[in-house]
Amino acid sequence: MGERFERNGEKKMKQLYELSRKFPKDWIKKAPKGKFGNYVPHPVITQRLLEVCGPFDWEVVELIRQETTGAVVGCFGKLTVEIDGKLVTVTSIGDVEHDQKNDGSNAKHAESVSFKRCAMKLGLGLHLWAGEEYYLDKQLDKKEIGKKTKLQSA
């Protein structure tokens, strides 16, 4: 794990490249009606992370509760993974899109969202968030070395 390779004197990151690759279209689920953004299910994200990086550490650091009722409405998660020989920790918040009227179910949904958002910060499924502005996979692709990606201003 963590194999780095060099091309033209530049260190390239094989695992980061693998994480940045777009998911096949048939693995991407359409957003429910009235919701924004297609998605890749949690188990697929988990399998890909294990396939590319091996075991990882995942922790729900804190449950976020609604002030008046105390119901779980989100969570703060932390994901630690070794990528190309470097230990990387990312954090993100996951919310409860549809209240399940049960703290356990709400925590499970929030954890799933938090985990996927953490994985996105490592490149997994990032193309779904970035849309047409996604370029990371091409930038990291060893075949694309020498080609410059023209960045657009926001």
Question: Where do the protein language model's features map onto the residues?
Answer:
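Interfaces that engage single-stranded nucleic acids at replication/repair/recombination sites
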Residues: 1-17, 24, 136-154
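Contiguous, often N-terminal, cationic amphipathic patches that form binding interfaces
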Residues: 9-42
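Positively charged, aromatic-enriched nucleic acid-contacting surfaces
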Residues: 40-144
